[in-house]
């Protein structure tokens, strides 16, 4: 059975179902798309025909559907919810009232209007809004003035008249004890009419103002007396009279209706928006409820507010208002005329006639939030009419004033806004979780590592080496002792911990893990086992709190002589007692380089006269006692010496430094004692000009196995020779004497080297010597010296010992003795050298002679080449010619070029053969010249031959 036989039923059924549903879906999509496209086509066709004046009845259904779908009708404001039904908006943290809103309790305990007086604070309430609101408001003034006898604002500003006009709709506003809602808009049927007459902008503004909390009275801005606010001068007059005043709060608030009785305040007339709540509304607004400024509205200060607040806002806003007022001057005159006629009987003119003001105040409370609100009308003014009496405010939540859309009937451009009501029963947003601050001082110390205590208990840590346990948390920075430390130490560390942790209380939590980790081991140093152990055993138990290694600023005692071991030990013991741990700088000098001992064993016990000549001076016999060879120091304390020396290296003057060991030279032992006087060829050739004759034993002076006391005493003077070198030198001999001295010294060297080479057996060098010898370029091979030259019985002449007196005589005697011998590698005899200037140039005075003689005589020459092994009879070649014989002279290059030009072209084979002949000799030729010769084209040669 194949796969198809087993699964064909399921496959076919799946394909059928898939095809079925796929067909259905495709059909549905196709139908829907067709209908949509047809509908769209019909709609577009209807629009085109409508524009062209044609319209088919068959398209009406589509048109009607389109109108229902696409054309949005303005929402009736009356269908919206009462803004009082909304809870007050939430306040920001720490905010008690909204910006610019000020609430004032009326004398009778009723809440006064929370007038909105900070129009400046609203960024959107700019001059544009002011001008927009001002203009429709002025358009609204004529109607209001005709109906209500309202005096236009322009006239008020110019004349200082306070048009306090009651809403004249033939109705009397019930006293404040009555419900303001019932009295306000229901009792004012005419409000809607003037509102309708108001431009859309005014309606929008009024709607937004109604939403501020005056909606409860349905105060239509045009309908109710939109009293323009007086000018600042008028405000001043009002304040002087202590009568209800129009407080023009900038362009936004033309004035706030202030009741002479002080109990009621009419809604503020904002210049652009002029919110005119009915006299009954102020109480309804909210007791102590801040009125959020409506869109584009300014929050006027409460009437009971001090004059400073009212005037400050008024003047500021009036300054802002000047421009929109000036723009509306054209409308104002007409309104002024009508307003004056209407206000003549009703409203008094401040500053003009007190009777008129009294009448006006009687009819309508003065607009403007002045601190004089609570005062009764001035001078014989009749009490406020009953309709002007405050009505009992409806209970409202504080701050329950939302800028809700106006409820105007105008079907114009009133936008539709809906505010989602705030559910007071909804659970308040949960505050942020307050993480309790824990006193870190009460917390246990951070845990320590489990392995730290045991290790520290077994072996005390080095003094000053227990480093603070630095962890990621800053609270654990204080160093923790091991658990095995004393109780006092633990208490001290715990107190320090608590002190530091309290300052860093951000670290919370409890830590139970022990983190007393063993401090890391000290860096490995050779031979430090004994010294640190002594320090740690002495100082570790005394440490209360782990501290960093102390740095000793005290200058250590002067360094002892390198051989004075007892003094070194005493200084080290005192130093260890003072310092918990040796400073890092107290390193011992490095171990002495290994020196082969064969030459030491074969050397005589007596000091070399040549060496004594360079080092031993009369009057300094005690330097041997002061300088004992450091190799005699027991090797058990090498590191203590190194540490001590390193401690005093910085304080010791440079002049007192010991000379560094000389680089290892393969010494060749000799059976005779004259080997101690010789200088190796490498040293002679590669000397540094420091008087190597006097110090040629420095290479052997550091042999740790040498125990020859006389040798040690002799070698002890070597370091001091450097110090003495800086002292004033003895008087220099004459030139001739210096010259003889230099030549004699070189000849003595050559003779001793020859004897040593012949008589000595090359010592077996160790691997250390091989490594040290390979560090530098191998010195030239030392060739044997002439056999016929030797001093008497190979004894070094004692006359060579340099002394302060008789120095010239010794040199002269040596010169006479060696005058018959020719100098090595030169044809110059010593007899011919007397006073000749030639010696300065050709005399092979070794460059490694003492500077006292070589540099002063001016006969320094380049290093000598190694002596040849030829017989002594063979005259050595002149030194200047040796360099020319080292390599073959290349063929003269200039002669090749003219040959190339003069020769006729040859075949390439001949050219190659010719070039091959000279290839060995023309290594220095320009390779491009040879290249050019080889690449001469063969065709050119043929053509040339044909010619």
From Swiss-Prot:
UniProt keyword Disulfide bond present: no
Annotated protein name in UniProt: Altered inheritance of mitochondria protein 3
Compositionally biased tracts (Pro residues): 379-395, 862-879
InterPro entries linked: Aim3
Sites bearing Phosphoserine, chain numbering: 57-58, 64, 476
Stretches with biased composition (Acidic residues): 59-69
This protein's record includes keyword Cell membrane: no
Subunit composition and interactions: Interacts with RVS167.
Compartments where located: Membrane raft
Name of the gene encoding the protein in the UniProt record: AIM3
Main localization of the protein described in the UniProt heading: membrane
Family: Belongs to the AIM3 family.
Keywords associated with the record: Membrane, Phosphoprotein
Mutant lacking the gene: phenotype: Increases frequency of mitochondrial genome loss.
One GO term describing the cellular component: actin cortical patch
A Gene Ontology biological process term: actin cortical patch assembly
Listed Basic and acidic residues bias regions: 70-84, 488-502, 749-759
